[in-house]
From Swiss-Prot:
Protein name: Imidazolonepropionase
Binding site for 4-imidazolone-5-propanoate: 77, 140, 173, 239, 316
Listed GO CC annotations: cytoplasm
Binding annotation for Fe(3+): 68, 70, 236, 311
Cofactor binding summary note: Binds 1 zinc or iron ion per subunit.
Superkingdom, natural source: Bacteria
Chief localisation class: cytoplasm
Lineage start: Bacteria, Pseudomonadati, Pseudomonadota, Gammaproteobacteria, Lysobacterales
GO biological process: L-histidine catabolic process to glutamate and formamide; L-histidine catabolic process to glutamate and formate
Residue numbers binding N-formimidoyl-L-glutamate: 140, 313, 315
Keywords for the protein's UniProt record, in alphabetical order: Cytoplasm, Histidine metabolism, Hydrolase, Iron, Metal-binding, Zinc
InterPro entries for this protein: Amidohydro-rel, HutI, Metal-dep_hydrolase_composite, Metal_Hydrolase
Catalyzed reactions per annotation: 4-imidazolone-5-propanoate + H2O = N-formimidoyl-L-glutamate
Pfam families: Amidohydro_1 (PF01979)
Amino acid sequence: MHVDTLWSNVHLITLDGEGLGVIRDGVLACADGRIVHVGPAGSDANLRPTTRIDGEGRWMSPGLIDCHTHLVYAGNRANEFEQRLQGISYAEIARAGGGIVSTVRATRAATPEQLASESRPRLLAMRAEGVTTLEIKSGYGLTLPDERKQLQVARALGEGCRVNVVTTFLGAHAIPPGREAQEYTDEVCNVMIPAIAAEGLAEAVDVFCENIAFSPAQARQVFEAARAHGLAIKIHAEQLSNQHGAELAASFGALSADHIEHLDDAGIAAMAAAGTVAVLLPGAFYFTRDTTLPPIAALRAAGVPLALATDSNPGTSPLTSPLLAMNMGATLFRLTVDECIAGFTREAARALGRGDRIGRLAIGMDCDLAIWDIDAPADLVYRIGFNPLHARVVRGQPDLPASWSNT
């Protein structure tokens, strides 16, 4: 069988099945951007590759997937970081006109070119750590033209940087200054969601359901509008208090419920029944100096899938390192190495509704890969402040190091 590229002499972290699915001394082949063979050394005898690459004993995993980011924005909120160091809470900052709305002002004022220029370095930092797929939310415009601008810039950045960008509409992120909450919710549902769906600018709709943002009733209204327009559902839930948002989202078959530090047993049961992924965001937990841990043990016991993400945003998680987020997941949330790696691959893909396309090394999946100079998979989680990425591959096309050649 002819194949485009065959990698040999690599240790595979397949994530196919339980655990990491490691195949030592493996081979992987792709054709037309998809994986067509995965197996141990010697299983490739009938393959005729155009390009053969010796992995030289490195490790290969699916390309990393960051399933929760707010990467496209303008401005800087270092001043709020200083305020929090002085003991002022995130909620107090938000109520005083800071927080999300301060980024809204800067993002509205930025041209698309300025927005792309400020956001590109953040995307490149993630790409440099093996990210091949990245979710980017809107939510810093809070008007239809400005939300549209964010989503368009996100899509363009992905195309220009060879990263698969999945866009999520988060118009229900904050109440704009001078607006009444219900009036604005009606606009999100009756004006913004129909337009965003018609223009094909987003795959999902998200809501920040919290006592400083949108009520459960308003979140329900947004979910109903999303469902009516064929968009998937996600939620920022139970970050600061238990609003029962995760349970609500699960009743709509949500892809994921994110943050969930204050999640209760009813929410866990609802997520388990619906197959809703728990997206854990240790960067925000760390940066806001939170002390309430997500109910990890109960989520495990219920069989809720656990994904990890950076939550990259200017206010509560200015983090662009998936590798550091993995370490935080282990040290702060007591996740295992397997859970951390799966959380940025297989389970992150599920949180984006793409579990049948990315996140595993298996026949038929997109050939999105990360190749690492490590001794064992645990090195991806254990070490801090280093980047062992050797190469990325997106749909079968490598970012070729100089040492690779066609042989």
